[in-house]
A protein has these predicted regions:
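Internal, well-ordered domain-core segments that constitute the primary functional module
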Residues: 33-140
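Outer-membrane beta-barrel "beta-signal"
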Residues: 57, 380-398
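Solvent-exposed loop/turn segments connecting transmembrane beta-strands
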Residues: 2-10, 174-175, 201-209, 302-306, ...
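C-terminal structural cap/anchor segments
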Residues: 245-335
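Long, internal scaffold/assembly segments composed of regular secondary structure
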Residues: 119-124, 132-255
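Short loop/turn motifs that connect adjacent beta-strands in outer-membrane beta-barrel proteins
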Residues: 19-23, 65-79, 110-123, 186-192, ...
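Transmembrane beta-strands of outer-membrane beta-barrel pores
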Residues: 1-4, 20-22, 29-35, 64, ...
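Extracellular loop and loop/strand-boundary signature of outer-membrane beta-barrel proteins
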Residues: 1-2, 43-48, 91-95, 167-170, ...
């Protein structure tokens, strides 16, 4: 049967945050928009999207591009650093690895003329997430290293010590995912065009670009002079290479120098069997199908070799009515170790309408209709949602 969904109610976001100049510090569960992709029109960041519920974190960040001194306004940067633990459950009741620790960081640099005289700008950055520590319910794995020295190892992406598994001693301690992000933008008077690429890495073979073009390729067009079509996004996501099928690290490196690697198996890990997920949903791109859709009830990602095409657009019908449309054409071939005999494909659609009454300040009313066709997520399905929201201060104190 199909894995049951989590039917419990929960608070999606709850956090405290303070800021001083360009620095912000937050504690709690908060949706974060860190990377180059648009948070509302993109198919989702490959490393850290908002597909899963927000992870409780202690986070320090410079969330907006800030000018680097002595660069005459040409160089800006932003980034963040956080750490916490994943109180994760699978299918709402099972815990395979208890008290898993979590680390995430990012840094981006942008070359841009802040005076607006030069139309081109470029961005380069890196994102890094790690699952580490914890105690596996599998007695063959058991408790994982979790000392402060091990924390330094996972932050730096270093090999594990003598108390780590053989795989982590050969490769790196913990379950790591990294993306190298690149962007180039042309800004005209009434429009802008931006291209971007997220190169997905699972280990050193990916960091050396041995996994080909795996990742997310995107184009974003902004049209400020056309309110009925303000923004258009096209994305191509491919994860079929994965540094080729074989993970050849089990050889004598002294007798046979050279790099092992291959069989990257994105979002999966031998020690952390629920993979790069939180409460059954992918922390990264939703196009690598989340464990909650596994029909056999097994943990992990069973469809991480994909080739997908995504379109998103938004605009305003009037000063008070806006819309958003998303369409994704999906193809999946299973995994490198468990390929599908026949590929699965499907199309996902979303239409979203928002209305703001001119006399009700801060209030917004909306509705969405979505549909999945094909067999990527199991059977075809449709759904809808209604939303009422209020933005602003509950009470202002003077």
């Amino acid at each position: 049967g199909v894995t049951p969904r989590d039917k419990h109610a929960y608070i999606h976001q709850l956090y405290a945050e303070i800021g001083y100049k360009c620095i912000e510090v937050s504690l709690g569960s908060k949706e974060r928009y860190l990377s180059l992709v648009d948070p509302f029109l993109s198919s989702g960041d490959m490393i850290y999207s908002n597909n899963a519920r927000p992870i409780p974190e202690m986070n320090i960040s410079i969330p907006r591009f800030t000018t680097v001194p002595l660069t005459k306004g040409w160089l800006q940067f932003k980034g963040n650093f956080d750490s916490d633990y994943l109180s994760d459950q699978y299918a709402g009741k099972y815990t395979f690895v208890e008290h898993v620790l979590w680390h995430q960081k990012s840094v981006y640099f942008q070359i841009s003329d802040t005076r607006g005289d030069f139309p081109l700008s470029g961005t380069v950055g890196v994102q890094h997430i790690v699952q580490w520590g914890g105690t596996s319910t599998n007695p063959k794995i058991g408790e994982q290293p979790h000392s402060f020295k091990d924390f330094v190892r996972i932050v730096l992406g270093a090999k594990g010590g003598g108390d780590a598994s053989l795989s982590d001693q050969i490769n790196v301690l913990g379950s790591h995912h990294i993306s190298f992000d690149f962007g180039l933008k042309y800004q005209a008077k009434d429009w802008s065009l931006r291209g971007y690429y997220q190169h997905l890495c699972y280990d050193k073979s990916g960091m050396e670009f041995k996994n080909g073009t795996d990742g997310l390729w995107g184009l974003e067009l902004n049209l400020s002079a056309f309110p009925w079509l303000k923004q258009f996004v096209f994305e191509y996501v491919t994860t079929r290479n994965q540094s080729r099928p074989f993970h050849d690290i089990w050889f004598d490196h002294d007798k046979h120098p050279g790099r092992g690697g291959g069989g990257d198996d994105y979002y999966n890990n031998g020690e952390y069997v629920t993979g790069n997920s939180y409460f059954n949903r992918s922390v990264g791109s939703p196009l690598l199908v989340s464990p909650e859709y596994n029909t056999d009830g097994a943990p992990g990602f069973q469809n991480n070799r994909v080739r997908d095409f995504h379109f998103g657009l938004k605009g305003d019908f009037s000063p008070h009515v806006s819309y958003r449309l998303l369409l994704t054409a999906m193809n999946t071939w299973g995994t490198g170790t468990a390929p599908l005999l026949k590929k699965r494909d499907g199309i996902s659609l979303l239409a979203d309408i928002q209305y703001q009454h001119p006399k009700l300040k801060g209030w917004q009313f909306g509705g969405s209709v979505g549909a999945d066709t094909g067999d990527v997520f199991g059977n075809s399905s449709t759904g809808f949602s209604l939303k009422v929201s209020k933005r602003g201060l509950l009470k202002a104190y003077k």
